[in-house]
Curated annotation (Swiss-Prot):
Binding site for ATP: A10, Y11, S12, G13, G14, L15, D16, T17, S18, G117
Protein name per Swiss-Prot or TrEMBL: Argininosuccinate synthase
Keyword Nucleotide-binding: yes
Top-rank taxon: Bacteria
Pathway assigned in UniProt: Amino-acid biosynthesis; L-arginine biosynthesis; L-arginine from L-ornithine and carbamoyl phosphate: step 2/3
Length: 403
């Protein structure tokens, strides 16, 4: 008797991946389920047991919150990654980590393949498959949902036929993905770019009408670009981000309504909630403004934009991403200090910043009697700075006279 091929499935506990377990078994595979917690608050024990109940031969659950925070979210923070100037890469950040864990489990289980539950029109199929092939080119990648092309009703009928539990929230019109860096939401009424998102589409943030009428002022401390404490209380990075989700979300900070250009060539309307991420990005940027020299500060946005594109496009495990990360690491050596932020009515407003590496010299900046700036030096500087345009003007006037 020939031995069954083994596949490791990225398992969420939802309908698609539960049906995928049974479908893959029918295709002749021994299915191992693998579920990660990257901060969405899943009941891992329940998910593990459900996978076994549906038919998986083994079920892994992995608490990856701190790894996600340190190795992935931190890169996004230090690079201020906002795809198309808006999207902090919530889902795009978790996909390479999930792919990494799938490969690790596959190698441990001596599996020949890995599988994911992505459809054929989203970005995630690209992110998963490119990442997996980058980490282990020998693994086969299966995409059951993309292959079976069932309608929702057909999928439910298949689940009922095989005794697969159907989630109680199946009637929700939305497609939601969440991790500690934020929450993404699409489908339903959100597919109409003119329609206002209903409050039911949000979860991490309060509507402005229900936010407090008095602000919360917090102090966020950074060490070499890493946020380490809030109001003097130190947290592991994953807990710090989740804490900021609570604090900033209570004030309605971090709602994003965005029509974005997908990697696969279509436009998609997405609603995001990223209270912690947006607060941290703003605070970190202000501390960089205080501690980076002008040339680095002016060049870094070019690297940031490219990093956002690389991550969005599924190229986390690429030489270009590694090179960009090397630049970022160098810029963070002196990004140490404290930033004071006011959270109020949908805004995270930076009100103060300080650092032992501050390049701001009050005696040079002041207009009082304590001014230490050499005003006479400005005359020679202006002459040399404007010399190229002055020479150009002289030459142009000579040409005009000749004409």
């Amino acid at each position: 008797m020939t031995q069954k091929k083994k596949v490791v499935l990225a398992y969420s506990g939802g309908l698609d991946t539960s049906v995928a377990i049974k479908w893959l078994q029918e295709q002749g595979y021994d299915v191992v389920a693998c579920c990660l917690d990257v901060g969405e608050g899943k009941d891992l024990a329940f998910v593990q047991q459900k996978a076994l109940q549906v038919g998986a031969s083994n079920s892994y659950v992995i608490d990856a919150k701190e790894e996600f925070a340190k190795e992935f979210a931190l890169t996004a923070l230090q690079a201020h990654t906002l795809y198309e100037g808006k999207y902090p890469l919530v889902s795009a950040l978790s996909r390479p980590l999930i792919a990494k864990k799938l490969v690790e489990v596959a190698e441990k289980e001596n599996a020949q393949a890995v599988a994911h539950g992505c459809t054929g029109k989203g970005n995630d199929q690209v992110r998963f498959e490119v990442s997996i092939k980058s980490l282990n080119p020998d693994l086969e990648v299966l995409a059951p949902v993309r292959e079976w092309k069932w309608s929702r009703d057909e999928e439910i009928a298949y689940a009922e036929k095989h005794g697969i539990p159907i989630p109680i929230n199946l009637d929700s019109p939305y497609s939601i993905d969440q991790n500690l860096w934020g929450r993404s939401n699409e489908c339903g009424v959100l597919e109409d770019p003119w329609a206002a998102p209903p409050e039911g589409a949000y979860d991490l943030t309060k509507p402005l009408e229900k936010t407090p009428d008095t602000p919360d002022v917090i102090e966020i401390a950074f060490e070499e670009g890493v946020p380490v404490s809030i109001d003097g209380t130190h947290y592991p990075l994953s807990d710090l981000i989740l804490k900021l989700n609570e604090l900033a979300g209570a004030h309605g900070v971090g709602r994003i309504d965005h029509v974005e250009n997908r990697l696969v060539g279509i436009k998609s309307r997405e609603v995001y909630e990223c209270p912690g991420a947006m607060t941290l990005i703003k605070a970190h940027k202000e501390l960089e403004d205080l501690t980076l020299v002008k040339e680095v500060a002016h060049f870094k946005p070019i690297i940031e934009q490219k990093m956002a594109e690389v991550i969005y496009n599924g190229l986390w495990f690429s030489p270009l991403k590694d090179a960009l990360s090397g630049f970022l690491k160098e810029t963070q050596k002196h990004v140490t200090g404290v930033v004071r932020v006011k959270l109020f009515k949908g805004h995270a407003i930076v009100e103060g910043r300080k650092s032992e590496y501050s390049l701001y010299d009050e005696k040079l900046a002041t207009y009082t009697k304590d001014d230490a700036f050499d005003h006479h030096a400005a005359v020679g500087f202006i002459e040399l700075w404007g010399l190229p345009t002055k020479v150009n003007s002289i030459v142009q006037k000579k040409e005009q006279i000749k004409a």
